[in-house]
Amino acid sequence: MAGESPSIQALRDLREASCGPVAGAADGAPTVTQDLSENVILTSLDDLHNWARLSSLWPLLYGTACCFIEFAALLGSRFDFDRFGLVPRSSPRQADLLIVAGTVTMKMAPALVRLYEQMPEPKYVIAMGACTITGGMFSADSTTAVRGVDKLIPVDLYMPGCPPRPEAIFDAVIKLRKKVANESVADRRQLQQTHRYCTVAHAMTAVEPIVTGAYLRAETQVAALQPGAGLPMPALETADAVQPSEPS
């Protein structure tokens, strides 16, 4: 073929002498023979990256209620949780899968969001149980239950049930692996930028902590206890009464 280097032409002649003429060689079209396809794996960077991630998902278990008891059954030999390559981690910085099982309260919501933010990208979230997805039985009249964890963090897979069986957890993991296998690095990066949260987050207001360590030290409590104790109660320590000591 005109324009080819001598080395390329020599390789082409050697290939035709051993296996016969190559189809498509006249127009320069690339070809893959049967022998080559049986010995060489052709893939893309996205497929290789997704295969490595779906084969070694490391979950962070965030259990707050009875759903976590069903998840604990997977750690035994009856269900063999390790066959999917899932290794539970105790640190969010080493995990790429967050499994939320149980009711999420307004007081625990900042801690949950902090754990999610500490996980490295790419990361996934599974909402396990009715209480996690919608608030469950506490969604009717509770003033502290969050009506769905997706109001705080993005959720990749919902697992309904009260509680879900261990077989349902396996089904959720398999579906998540299929989702990871079809992802692209560029698409995942764009998803993080444009759709950070699935729904509107709660409008939380920071308040002073209820437990201050000064139990029964309020002025009204001290005045009520003095007659019954018959002893002088210690004076109430305030910020104005405590004076810093001068250095000697």
Curated annotation (Swiss-Prot):
Annotated GO biological process: aerobic respiration; electron transport coupled proton transport; photosynthesis, light reaction
The cofactor remark states: Binds 1 [4Fe-4S] cluster.
Any idea which GO molecular function terms this record carries?
4 iron, 4 sulfur cluster binding; iron ion binding; NADH dehydrogenase (ubiquinone) activity; quinone binding
Cysteine pairings via disulfide bonds: none
Q: Which cofactor does the UniProt annotation name?
A: [4Fe-4S] cluster
Q: Which residues bind [4Fe-4S] cluster?
A: 66-67, 131, 162
Q: Which UniProt keywords apply?
A: 4Fe-4S, Iron, Iron-sulfur, Membrane, Metal-binding, NAD, NADP, Plastoquinone, Quinone, Thylakoid, Translocase, Transport
User: Which Gene Ontology cellular component annotation is one that this UniProt entry carries?
Assistant: respiratory chain complex I
The record describes its membrane topology as: Peripheral membrane protein
Q: Where in the cell is it found?
A: Cellular thylakoid membrane
State if Iron is listed as a keyword. yes
Task: Show the catalytic activity.
Answer: a plastoquinone + NADH + (n+1) H(+)(in) = a plastoquinol + NAD(+) + n H(+)(out); a plastoquinone + NADPH + (n+1) H(+)(in) = a plastoquinol + NADP(+) + n H(+)(out)
Q: What is its EC number?
A: 7.1.1.-
Q: Which residues cross the membrane?
A: none
Among NCBIfam families, the record links this protein to: nuoB_fam (TIGR01957), PRK06411.1 (NF005012)
Quaternary structure and interacting proteins, as annotated: NDH-1 can be composed of about 15 different subunits; different subcomplexes with different compositions have been identified which probably have different functions.
Family per similarity comment: Belongs to the complex I 20 kDa subunit family.
Q: What does this protein do?
A: NDH-1 shuttles electrons from an unknown electron donor, via FMN and iron-sulfur (Fe-S) centers, to quinones in the respiratory and/or the photosynthetic chain. The immediate electron acceptor for the enzyme in this species is believed to be plastoquinone. Couples the redox reaction to proton translocation, and thus conserves the redox energy in a proton gradient. Cyanobacterial NDH-1 also plays a role in inorganic carbon-concentration.
Q: Which PANTHER family match?
A: NADH DEHYDROGENASE, NADH DEHYDROGENASE [UBIQUINONE] IRON-SULFUR PROTEIN 7, MITOCHONDRIAL
State the name under which the record lists this protein. Answer: NAD(P)H-quinone oxidoreductase subunit K
Q: Which organism is it from?
A: Synechococcus sp. (strain WH7803)
Q: Which gene encodes it?
A: ndhK
